[in-house]
């Protein structure tokens, strides 16, 4: 028998989400009692096992803030300049700090126009007025409404209450409430400005109790880089990013691996590498903290059709997870998630968390443009391998950067729209609720037990049809089962 026939006879069978279900198990576990927190790197523990994709129609700073507040993690895409991406990371970090250390300030002799420019640029409503490192006033948007052309010192509030570096959250909140102020400068022993506490940050800390934060009280954030963009990784690391996500269509590329090893040594942030779909890749990526699994499962990806390469996602997750376990690496399943039940299946197959694109692209916080089609609201969504994304700068992800002219790009993705789905909070509520329900059915109290107790059954096409609503005309659309996909 020829070797080519042997290839076919020895080929493994690959399964994806629609090919499997989990078998119900005896349980005492109630969905409301399960713990959905998960570790995705040695230093990053999430309160929900969900990351937003590093795509230019999915994750910029607003999505990253929303994800972190709900207990997940946003990965800011790299289809922008280094300076822009660094600023995006900083905006996430500034969103909820207890004490903001890199305070944006202004001198008393500056114009009101410049004060407005700074506020709009950095997304803030007020500025400490500083002279020789000492606070001499506070200027806010309320102070300068319709008063262009004047100087800061003419309109600033001069009587400024300050606090020492030793102040705690409750004390700061009490001072601000008693004095009816929303900004509290922090000064050192010499009276020099070293930080700023804002009422909005304190309120957010109490409102978003499930948020993931570092020891400074800052929201966690990740950012994507090319394996060959060392400067970008270093600048993001300096900006305080918590996780560097090396973002390439095929991470098991030997040139990329050499570059990633060098990058790993020069950044202190935790390090995730993707994407892969072959357990052999794990052997060469042991320098990473986690690997990201998925070659072509995304709704906007055409890699499997254009290149003929990929592994159905459930099988890819399982194969990679088995190998990753040997090295103590974490696994993130990236792509192909259509319903909350798919998240349950991905984790049961070995993933520690999932990355979502399509399901989050239609949210208010996603950067895609809103469009109206036949009276219904949609948001633009495109693959990073689509022609539009490649023209903007994403070609390198598919090893088509530099030498290829725009008209010669070979896209591995498409562009389109998805239905508007409301806020990130609303979408995640349904997804996490479905995950908790699935854990209850299999008797899993936490993510670890879901991996251990989840048993699969392979289903037929008839089984899949039976799994969905059938023999009915649906008149009221459920929030977790959209009629239009």
From Swiss-Prot:
TM spans (from-to): none
Protein keywords: CBS domain, GMP biosynthesis, Metal-binding, NAD, Oxidoreductase, Potassium, Purine biosynthesis, Repeat
Swiss-Prot/TrEMBL catalytic activity: IMP + NAD(+) + H2O = XMP + NADH + H(+)
Notes on how activity is controlled: Mycophenolic acid (MPA) is a non-competitive inhibitor that prevents formation of the closed enzyme conformation by binding to the same site as the amobile flap. In contrast, mizoribine monophosphate (MZP) is a competitive inhibitor that induces the closed conformation. MPA is a potent inhibitor of mammalian IMPDHs but a poor inhibitor of the bacterial enzymes. MZP is a more potent inhibitor of bacterial IMPDH.
Pfam families: CBS, IMPDH
A biological process from GO: GTP biosynthetic process
SUPFAM superfamilies the record matches: CBS-domain pair, Inosine monophosphate dehydrogenase (IMPDH)
Biochemical pathway: Purine metabolism; XMP biosynthesis via de novo pathway; XMP from IMP: step 1/1
Sequence positions that bind IMP: 299, 334-336, 357-358, 381-385, 412
EC numbers, comma separated: 1.1.1.205
Residues that bind NAD(+): 247, 294-296
Keyword Transport: no
Annotated residues for binding of K(+): 296, 298, 301, 466-468
Record-annotated CBS domain positions: 99-154, 156-212
Entries under InterPro entries matching the protein: Aldolase_TIM, CBS_dom, CBS_dom_sf, IMP_DH, IMP_DH/GMP_Rdtase_CS, IMP_DH_GMPRt
GO molecular function ontology, one term from the record: nucleotide binding
Cofactor: K(+)
Family stated for the protein in its record: Belongs to the IMPDH/GMPR family.
Function in brief: Catalyzes the conversion of inosine 5'-phosphate (IMP) to xanthosine 5'-phosphate (XMP), the first committed and rate-limiting step in the de novo synthesis of guanine nucleotides, and therefore plays an important role in the regulation of cell growth.
Subunit structure: Homotetramer.
HAMAP family xref list: IMPDH
Protein's name according to its UniProt entry: Inosine-5'-monophosphate dehydrogenase
């Amino acid at each position: 028998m020829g070797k080519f026939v042997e290839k076919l006879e020895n080929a493994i069978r690959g399964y994806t989400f629609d090919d499997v279900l989990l078998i119900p198990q005896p349980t005492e576990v109630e969905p409301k009692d399960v713990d959905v927190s998960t570790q995705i790197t040695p230093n990053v523990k999430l309160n929900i096992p969900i990351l937003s994709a590093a795509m230019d129609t999915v994750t910029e700073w607003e999505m990253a803030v929303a994800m972190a507040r709900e207990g997940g993690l946003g990965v800011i895409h790299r289809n922008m300049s280094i300076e822009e991406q660094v600023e995006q990371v900083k905006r996430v970090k500034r969103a909820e700090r207890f004490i903001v250390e890199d305070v944006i300030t202004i001198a008393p002799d500056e114009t009101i126009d410049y004060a407005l420019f700074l506020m709009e640029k950095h997304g803030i409503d007020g500025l400490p007025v500083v002279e020789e490192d000492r606070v001499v006033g506070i200027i806010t948007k309320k102070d300068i409404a319709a008063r262009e052309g004047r100087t800061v010192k003419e309109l600033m509030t001069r009587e400024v209450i300050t606090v020492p570096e030793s102040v705690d959250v409750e004390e700061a909140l009490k001072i601000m409430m008693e004095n009816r102020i929303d900004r509290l400068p922090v000064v050192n022993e010499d009276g020099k400005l070293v930080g700023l506490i804002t009422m909005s940050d304190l309120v957010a800390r109490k409102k978003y109790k499930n948020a993931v934060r570092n020891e400074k009280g800052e929201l966690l954030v990740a950012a994507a880089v090319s394996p060959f963009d060392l400067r970008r990784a270093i600048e993001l690391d300096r900006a305080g990013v918590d996780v560097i996500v090396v973002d390439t269509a095929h991470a098991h590329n030997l040139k990329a691996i050499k570059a990633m090893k060098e990058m790993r040594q020069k950044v202190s942030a935790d390090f995730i590498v993707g994407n892969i779909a072959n357990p052999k890749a794990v052997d060469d990526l042991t320098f990473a903290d986690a690997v990201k699994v998925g070659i072509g499962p995304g709704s906007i990806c055409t890699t499997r059709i254009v290149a003929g390469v990929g592994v159905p996602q459930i099988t890819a997750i399982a194969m990679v997870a088995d190998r990753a376990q040997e090295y103590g690496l974490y696994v993130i399943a990236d792509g192909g998630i259509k319903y909350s039940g798919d998240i349950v299946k991905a984790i049961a197959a070995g993933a520690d968390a999932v990355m979502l694109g399509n399901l989050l692209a239609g949210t208010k916080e996603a950067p895609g443009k809103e469009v109206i089609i036949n009276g219904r609201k949609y948001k633009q969504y495109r693959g990073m391998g689509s022609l539009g994304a490649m023209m903007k700068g994403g070609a390198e992800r598919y090893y088509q950067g530099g030498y290829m002219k725009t008209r010669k790009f070979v896209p591995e993705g498409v562009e389109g729209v998805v239905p508007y789905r409301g806020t990130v909070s609303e979408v995640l509520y349904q997804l996490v609720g479905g995950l908790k329900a699935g854990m209850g059915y299999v008797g899993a109290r936490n993510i670890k037990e879901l991996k251990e107790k989840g048993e699969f059954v392979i289903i037929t096409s008839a089984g899949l049809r039976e799994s969905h609503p059938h023999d009915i005309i649906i008149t009221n659309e459920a929030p977790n089962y959209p009629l239009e996909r």
